[in-house]
Amino acid sequence: MKKCLVWLLAAALLLAGCGKKTASQAESLRQRYREMQAAHMEAEITCHLDTENRTFTVSCDWTPTGAGTTVTGPEDLAGLTASVSGEDLTVSYDGAALSAGSLRDVAPANCLPWLLRAMEEGYLVEAGQETLEGLDCLRLALDTTAPGGKVLCTVWLGGDGAPLYAEFSQDSRVVLTAR
């Protein structure tokens, strides 16, 4: 019985050490995101609605002062552009621009910049190692706040620190995914 207890205590100490390593790795990676001055991202965004899912392919250019997201697919929406500056959203297509007002929630137009903001400023709820599609990943769950309520951003990061997959949840429901 004593040998079993010794092994359990040793395992607990090893696991505690792994948790510290993961937290340190997460903080180091988040610091890299805080220092970033520009980013270009491409992703497949799926919006999970009550009755259906809608998928878009987007390209996003981000700087600390704003971001522009352009829909590249499906073809009938290709070229639609959303510009995000602070809390303001402008949608444009074929030269015409329309102020879409204030962003209150995470949406396909702002989820990639939201992901970067979450990596910089979000409250780290959880950090751990996981496998995603055969790749070892660092998984972070980051709590962010929006005027429309809390958004939990869960992101799986590859060995180079780049996001491989992200989920955005509101009211315990996944509303958007990015891959």
Question: Model-derived features: where do they sit?
Answer:
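Flexible, processing/modification-adjacent segments and terminal tails
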Residues: R34, A43, C47, V91-P147
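Sec-dependent bacterial lipoprotein signal peptides
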Residues: M1-A16
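A glycine-biased structural micro-motif
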Residues: A38, G79-T81, G134
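An acidic-aromatic
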Residues: S59-W114, R173-V174
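Short, surface-exposed coil-to-beta transition loops
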Residues: N53-T57, L77-L80, G148-C153, V175
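N-terminal leader/targeting segments and the immediate start of mature chains
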Residues: A16-T65, D76
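Gly/Pro-enriched, hydrophobic low-complexity segments
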Residues: G68, V125-R179
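Beta-strand elements of well-folded, non-transmembrane domains
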Residues: I45-T51, W62-G66, G73-E75, G95, ...
